[in-house]
């Protein structure tokens, strides 16, 4: 009698086209391990990512706006979930491997810093050799999670996590789906958040966006997703049509000009570099202040690497707690 995993693998042979990746044909893991009887290898990757500490910490990491007051702004976690849903929809329609797509999407931002891209820019300036969140995401799943053992994900998932950023050599079509879904998600939900914050008003976006993509968030996402599916249906690459590509590029340029570089939205970012550098430098000069796991990394790979790993994994709130603990005098009472 076959097990549930084998049944699912047989189903994939019917549901996944020749352009997709079959779980049964996976290149395997860094460390071989027995198969699960219930789940395919990519389904196990999904579960490992969702249950890891780095994934949970995304709920307290900035998406765009630093320390927003309000319950409905996106965080790095809600962004990740939106990317995963968009990517899975596209993958299903194109008969690619939905589970691999979802695993890549859920893991793609695990290495993101506190304070969003402002934090990434700060660590890129601080750490010798530079800091890139997609490389750190791979390091999280390979080296930092599970007390240094890593999650031991499938190679297809690992490569997809590394390759989710524009300009990085492609891996699978599933990885390409995540790469585009990431962009679809962030330009749309960041516009929604910018309107909520009063930085933009409804209708401020260029006319080409409203004409070709739609007015509401759901309309824009549906227009782009539908176009990607129709354009990519018979291709070995994931693309948008020329008309939608033009509109999305105008959309992206508009967001960079009016939101991502807006002095109101970015007014507090100048403080981020000083805070992160102060914490990082303190750990470099005082390795004994690092947790034991990171002191072990310092022994193997150097204190600068260990300090970067630790600081990049912090949430926005924890960074401030650490900063106050390290640098702000504590109140005391004379008895």
Q: Residue ranges of each PLM-predicted region?
A:
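Short alpha-helix carrying the canonical HExxH Zn2+-binding catalytic motif
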Residues: 102-107, 180-181
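Conserved short loop/turn motifs at secondary-structure junctions
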Residues: 106-107, 124-125, 296
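Short active-site segment of divalent metal-dependent hydrolases/proteases
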Residues: 111-115, 185
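Alpha-helical ligand/cofactor-binding cores
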Residues: 106, 120, 138
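Histidine-centered, transition-metal-coordinating active-site segments
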Residues: 1-80, 84-90, 97-98, 130-335
